[in-house]
Amino acid sequence: MKAIFLDKDGTLVDDIPYNVEPRRISLCPGAGSGLRLLARLDYHFFVVSNQSGIAHGRFAEADLKAVGNRLADLLFREQIELEGFYYCPHHPDGSVARYALDCFCRKPLPGMLLNAAQEHDIDLHASWMVGDILHDVEAGNRAGCRTLLIDNGNETEWRLGPRRIPTRIAPDLYTGAVLIASEEGARR
């Protein structure tokens, strides 16, 4: 199985910091049509998201269930199935002791992608990590995926390194999907 791993905030949905209110969650413009294009190429969809608001006490981990349900509903309306919603609740500087730690799941480390790959038999080399910051790119590269940076202005720490170079760059998810589709066509 090949997958599209999607960062949530700023990539798939509009970026409203620490938002867990389902009514305020909406897909980024062009996200639905871009994902439909990729679904026709037999990609499966997974969200992988750092949710440090849990570690910082901004919201409870239980609040993410409603977020996952809202994402699944929004994508269902676009005729897309969300097959997994993975999140990291940790942050080393968190104020909630249980979550204030370094971990392997927090991007830029690849833990969420590797867990999804193991649980769903995903071919990481045939998959893409799509996100709006270089931590997303680094996580995808560390996992062995191809990577797409959505350059929408959200990246503020342009610390470059060999693992932080994306395979492709696009201004939005729809344009990125077209690039992925064209690369897929070139491989055939």
Where are these regions (language model features)?
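Substrate-recognition element of Asp-dependent hydrolases with the DxDx(T/V) motif
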Residues: 31, 35-74, 80-94, 140
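Short secondary-structure boundary segments
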Residues: 50-51, 151-154, 173
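Acidic, Mg2+-coordinating phosphoryl-transfer loop and its flanking beta/alpha structural elements
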Residues: 125-168
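Conserved Lys-Pro-Asp/Glu-containing loop-to-beta segment of HAD-superfamily phosphomonoesterases
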Residues: 104-137
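Active-site neighborhood of HAD-like aspartate-dependent phosphohydrolases
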Residues: 1-47
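Short glycine-enriched, charge-decorated loop/helix-capping segments at active-site entrances
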Residues: 18-26, 59-62, 99-103
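Short acidic-hydrophobic, aromatic-tinged amphipathic segments that line or gate anion-handling sites
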Residues: 167-176
